[in-house]
Amino acid sequence: MKMILALVVLGLVLVAAEDKYTTKYDNIDVDEILKSDRLFGNYFKCLVDNGKCTPEGRELKKSLPDALKTECSKCSEKQRQNTDKVIRYIIENKPEEWKQLQAKYDPDEIYIKRYRATAEASGIKV
């Protein structure tokens, strides 16, 4: 009986762990990436399938569709903060790149409609 209970608990822990994105890259300096046209360009090209991806770029690219679909429900607080920062930066400073990202990840404008009020409440004009 104890063995079965231990297996059930282990299973629940593993399922709970899968319900969050990895925090392995949470300490990346997002400001440094946004300040550098080269670094920003590399990540952007990765996301739109026009360039190679770093390991963290691959992880972002893999998680992005699910994060949009689930309203970032699996994101850590740091990931949410960085997401807001990056979206604000791209909208304000890289409108052409924003259009390309929207075309790839939200061509039917499903997510942008859902997030518009939340974004604008945070001071992000979408």
Swiss-Prot record:
Tissue expression per record: Specifically expressed in the ejaculatory bulb and seminal fluid.
UniProt keyword annotations, A-Z: Behavior, Secreted, Signal
Location relative to the cell: Secreted
Any one GO biological process: response to virus
InterPro entries (alphabetical): A10/PebIII, OS_D_A10/PebIII_sf
Signal peptide annotation: 1-17
Pfam families: OS-D
Source taxon at top rank: Eukaryota
Any Gene Ontology CC annotation: extracellular region
Function per UniProt: Protein component of the posterior mating plug.
Family note: Belongs to the insect A10/OS-D protein family.
UniProt cross-references to PANTHER family, sorted A to Z: CHEMOSENSORY PROTEIN-RELATED, EJACULATORY BULB-SPECIFIC PROTEIN 3-RELATED
Protein name (Swiss-Prot/TrEMBL): Ejaculatory bulb-specific protein 3
Species assigned in the record: Drosophila melanogaster
Lineage per the UniProt record: Eukaryota, Metazoa, Ecdysozoa, Arthropoda, Hexapoda
Gene name as annotated: EbpIII
